[in-house]
Amino acid sequence: MDLQKQLEELKISTQEKLKEMTGNHTKELQDLRVQVLGKKGSLTELLKGLKDLSNDLRPVVGKQVNEVRDILTKAFEEQAKVVEAAKIQAQLESESVDVTLPGRQMTLGHRHVLTQTSEEIEDIFLGMGFQVVDGFEVEKDYYNFERMNLPKDHPARDMQDTFYITEEILLRTHTSPVQARTMDQHDFSKGPLKMISPGRVFRRDTDDATHSHQFHQIEGLVVGENISMGDLKGTLQLISQKMFGAERKIRLRPSYFPFTEPSVEVDVSCFKCGGKGCNVCKQTGWIEILGAGMVHPSVLEMSGIDSEKYSGFAFGLGQERIAMLRYGINDIRGFYQGDVRFTDQF
């Protein structure tokens, strides 16, 4: 067969095969390219026939070979684009989303049980006319201890192991410094001070089922004229009933805190057994929930408040303890370990 005719037939047959290829023929396209244009391909075999042509015909056929090679090379490149586009389109169609289908319900998170407890307690106090005041977690020794009637040589400082950053800077061991700063700024000509200060506090405790090196407190303070122990008891009675039920009673036991005088521990009648005695109240009928007392005159005087004219009461409770009592939780570490099997229960 004439070499020129073979070249034309190779061009035509290859072009026809290329037109039949779609997105599913990526491998076939590559195989055909090797078969036609490869080192051992059809076009290379035809080139070998040039040596048998006459000197006059050889340049003419050689030019035709180059033209066919260029045409087929371009054809392969264009068809490769067509095949790739078809492949992408097929993939898009197979992965398309039916927008008429109902959406998938996502798993939603919720507030942590300690956050829920804190917000509930804050709402109770807001309803009683208290203001919520935030403060610094990194605090000065002066506000954390000295302003709470705990000078540097006071033995009661041993009651709280402290994380010191420097000799004068520490992680607060209670939220009482917020109260000291607020008393400094309050204008008593506009009425009494009624505040709570919630937040994290830090003490050098060994973590176990009932202790943690960090936990949460809400401390409350009321300062004004003629504030009495009766006001404190009435406030605590209302708080206990709001948190644990309207039938709850409280009792006050003498205690000691450097910043209050007199000081008391506050117990609430057991909400599980109604005061009859059970494992929750350790057969006593009462559960300790917080500490409180009348603000020490020295604490008032350090804020420039006339202790002869003004008096006040203070109290402090822990959100973890309240939550543990309400929900029957026996290990405080569960609040901080991030185990959703625990947190999802609340």
UniProtKB/Swiss-Prot annotation:
Belongs to the class-II aminoacyl-tRNA synthetase family. Phe-tRNA synthetase alpha subunit type 1 subfamily. SUPFAM superfamilies: Class II aaRS and biotin synthetases, tRNA-binding arm. GO terms for cellular component: cytoplasm. The lineage of its organism: Bacteria, Bacillati, Bacillota, Bacilli, Lactobacillales. It is an enzyme of class 6 (ligase). Its cofactor is Mg(2+). This is Phenylalanine--tRNA ligase alpha subunit. Binds 2 magnesium ions per tetramer. Its EC number is 6.1.1.20. GO terms for biological process: phenylalanyl-tRNA aminoacylation. It is found in: Cytoplasm. Mg(2+) binds at residue 261. CDD domains: PheRS_alpha_core. It comes from Streptococcus agalactiae serotype V (strain ATCC BAA-611 / 2603 V/R). Tetramer of two alpha and two beta subunits. InterPro entries: aa-tRNA-synth_II, aa-tRNA-synth_II/BPL/LPL, Phe-tRNA-synth_IIc_asu, Phe-tRNA_ligase_II_N, Phe_tRNA_ligase_alpha1_bac, Phenylalanyl-tRNA_Synthase, tRNA-bd_arm. One of its GO terms (molecular function) is phenylalanine-tRNA ligase activity.
